[in-house]
From Swiss-Prot:
The gene is rplO. GO terms for molecular function: rRNA binding; structural constituent of ribosome. Keywords: Ribonucleoprotein, Ribosomal protein, RNA-binding, rRNA-binding. This is Large ribosomal subunit protein uL15. Residues 30-63 are annotated as: Disordered. Residues 36-49 have a biased composition (Basic residues). One of its GO terms (cellular component) is cytosolic large ribosomal subunit. Binds to the 23S rRNA. NCBIfam families: rplO_bact. It comes from Xylella fastidiosa (strain 9a5c). Part of the 50S ribosomal subunit.
Amino acid sequence: MIMSLRLNDLKPALGASSCRARVGRGIGSGLGKTAGRGHKGSFARKGGGKIKPGFEGGQTPMQRRLPKIGFRSRSVANTAEVLSYKLDNLEPGEIDFASLRLAKLVPSTAKKAKIVKKGRLTKVFVLKGIESTAGARAMIETTGGSFQE
């Protein structure tokens, strides 16, 4: 006789699953009275053990003991750095923020660009409305380029 296996006949292997512990049901159960929570303290209370991050038991927490130092400038997040040697890949002439974005030298999230000196520059550029470091400005001007605000 061949028995077919059906979904309603499936059950876990013997000893693979155990019943949920029913706590607070008398001393004979092993989990009566305090229900495995011990005596008193925060862990014995409902919602116990849930403490705020950084809480040190009433002691002044670390984030209040240490001094507040520095900050992150928002303008840095909106400014993209363009290395000066990458400008040599562009055609010589006028360069503005839109042309840098078209050349994919500036990400779409940036609101302004700044030229940083790195490498050499051989072509002549006229930069419109683009910031630069002192070294990059000197390098662009020595090649015959200029800046327009």
